[in-house]
Amino acid sequence: FKLYPLTYTELEQYPQDLDFDSVFRTYHLKRKKIDQERLYELLWTGFYPRVYDKHLDSYKWYENYIFTYVERDVRSLLNVRNLRTFEHFLILCASRSAQLIDYSDLSNALGVSLPTIKEWISLLETSGLIFILPAYFENFSKRIVKTPKIYFSDTGLLCHLLSIRTVKQLKVHPLLGSIFETFIVGECFKRFY
């Protein structure tokens, strides 16, 4: 099994409901007013427990996390000749969070083969950095062939990869809507996977 970053309800210590419908209930929100500033701060800081347990500077922590991930994990799991290209791939994926995956576009932008891009996406998914949300259609065949969306499992990591260095920058960032969508979909995903 995979351990994803904390959910908003875990971090804010709300009671945990295990059924899907509970995600859409608002009774637990009445107990505590959601502070918009706190929400921006959480989106920027992300939800990895270590940042909160150790009271770490989240931006530096994500920098080290990415370096360790790329240097250790990627190097050992894949035969990546140019780690810098993989880092650019991570950044391009971040810029496409909450969007349809366009493998060809990633391939062309990086000058890397399509099978390599698919292998790298699979690695990100297997390691829990991203998750893929299949298209939903009542027709099962359409679900299989339609393009899925890519989401990062943590908004702090996403913000770091997008070079968002402060909460103030997050508030005016052109991808704020995608970051917020990543947060909402991620909350649903992390509760049930």
Language-model features: where?
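Accessory nucleic acid-recognition modules appended to NTPase machines
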Residues: 52-193
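A residue-level signal for conserved active-site and pocket-lining positions in enzyme catalytic cores
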Residues: 11, 46, 89
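A generic structural signal for short hydrophobic patches within well-formed alpha-helices
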Residues: 8-11, 157-158
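Amphipathic alpha-helical "lid/sensor" segments that cap RecA-like P-loop NTPase cores
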Residues: 28-65
